[in-house]
Amino acid sequence: MVVFLHSGDYDRVHQGLSIAAAAVASGRRAEVYLFWWALERFLKDALDEPDFAGRPDVADRFESRGMPTPRVLLEHLRDSGLFTLAGCTGSLGALGAEPLAGQSGIDVWLGWSAILQRTAGVTDRFYL
C-alpha cells in the first residue's frame, strides 16, 4: 500500500503514518512518499510535539491519552522491515533543501517518473 503525503499538517502526517502502521502490522508492505510541506516537516525533524493549530484541547487530549507521535509511528514502521520512506526530488529542490537530504533519514529520493513506476498497479493508495 502507498501513502502520498503532501500536507505537512500534524494531523495528516499522523494519519498517513497510522495507515502505514496498520498495513505493516498486518504483514503488508507500506511506502510513504513525501512531497512539499510533508517533506519539509520531516526535513525539519518536527515529528514530536502535537501541533493542532488553534486546537490546544486536541493537543492536550492527544498527549493525555498517550497517542503515538509521528516519530513513534515512524520507529514502529522502520522496525517492521516492511516500510520505505521516499522523498520527492522535485519538492526537495523547490524547498531549496538539497543540503538536508543526506541527513534526513529518508530511504530513497525519487522523481515522478520513478514514483509512477514503483507504484504502478498498487490498488491501496491514500492521498493526504
Model-derived segments and their meaning:
Residues 30-36, 86-88:
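Short internal beta-strands
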Residues 72-128:
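A charged, amphipathic interaction segment
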Residues 1-14, 30, 42, 62:
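Short, glycine-rich nucleotide/cofactor-binding loops
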